[in-house]
């Protein structure tokens, strides 16, 4: 949400602790309830990283998952968003991060001062200056290497949909090729990489007054299918 936490830490693309805690609480309170999880953008990266980290336990708690518009490779994504038309998205995203960092610095004066934060002009620079040191990474390169979900995909044991558009301004298309190769070796991964859809958009249809929302339907259909399959397996004599 938009409300900042009160801790010195922010959130980041590899922070799976909050998700793990939420899933643990849900499964304790509703142990027999089927559970599906969907994550979008940064949340999708966190979800996939969690599923890979918890490969031995995740499938006992989660029926299915869906990750949308995921920045699978954070290093390549940070370079890509700093080029061409994608820089417009970087500015919007970066301005939001800088506002949050300055607000956080008012609570924790040891964090980088506002003037230094305001001088940041790229996402990679922000991660070098703020994200990495605040969260215990050596630098942005270390943060990207340890937090990118692409390195965890082969470990996933929960049936998971990966929905990304080829024209996503946050990720170079060649990364999706690498993800596709990994998915071919993991039967739990289903990829859907349409040419168009932008970043978490996927709006289509010929009539602008009656748009077709592909994202919601695709994710809903996938999760419903997995729930139905799980229900059938549980009711077999």
What are these regions (language model features)?
Residues 150, 166-169, 176, 196-198:
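Acidic beta-to-alpha connecting loop that harbors the catalytic carboxylate
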Residues 156, 162-164:
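Short beta-strand/loop motif that positions the catalytic acidic residue
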Residues 197-212:
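Catalytic histidine-centered segment of alpha/beta-hydrolase-like enzymes
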């Amino acid at each position: 949400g938009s409300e900042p936490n009160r801790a010195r830490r922010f959130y980041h693309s590899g922070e799976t602790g909050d998700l793990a805690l939420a899933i643990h609480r849900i499964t304790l309170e509703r142990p027999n309830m089927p559970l599906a999880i969907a994550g979008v953008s940064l949340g999708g990266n966190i979800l996939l990283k969690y599923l890979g980290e918890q490969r031995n336990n995740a499938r006992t708690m989660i029926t299915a998952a869906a990750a949308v518009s995921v920045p699978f490779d954070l290093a390549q994504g940070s370079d890509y968003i700093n080029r061409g038309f994608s820089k417009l998205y970087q500015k919007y995203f970066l301005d939001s991060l800088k506002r949050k960092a300055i607000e956080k610095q008012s609570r924790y004066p040891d964090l980088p001062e506002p003037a230094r934060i305001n001088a940041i002009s790229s996402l990679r620079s922000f991660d070098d200056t703020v994200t990495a040191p605040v969260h215990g990474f050596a630098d942005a390169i270390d943060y990207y290497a340890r937090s990118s979900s692409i390195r965890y995909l082969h470990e996933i044991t929960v049936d998971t949909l990966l929905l990304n558009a080829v024209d996503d301004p946050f990720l170079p298309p060649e990364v999706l090729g690498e993800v596709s190769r990994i998915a071919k070796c993991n039967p739990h991964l289903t990829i859907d990489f349409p040419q168009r859809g932008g970043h978490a958009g996927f709006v289509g249809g010929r009539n602008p007054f009656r748009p077709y929302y592909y994202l919601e339907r695709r994710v809903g259909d996938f999760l419903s299918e997995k729930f139905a399959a799980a229900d059938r397996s549980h009711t077999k004599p």
